[in-house]
């Protein structure tokens, strides 16, 4: 068995398979479409998350800020910042290519922030999805 095949087998061990969550509008952004793909690895206690949002209104229309930030919230209510989404204003598209979070069951939230480095959301999230 080659190194690549062995690495792929090792990387796949403990994986639970990708979970796809379809987003079809929210109270604050009715035209929003997209998906969140979460690939949990329960053996390692982590999840790889990808976010792809279409028809996403500019951040200024959804809150007081210029940056979309993705967050996790664990069962105890502790916040974790995943990072800022890449926003393409002309295409009205928001993406986060890939992040690994140290949880396998959590709420994923997206808020609008003036400072993408804050420790917790400062505005009401416009998108909330439970990942499990």
Please name every model-derived segment.
Residues 15-132:
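N-terminal targeting/export leaders
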Residues 1-15:
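Sec-dependent bacterial lipoprotein signal peptides
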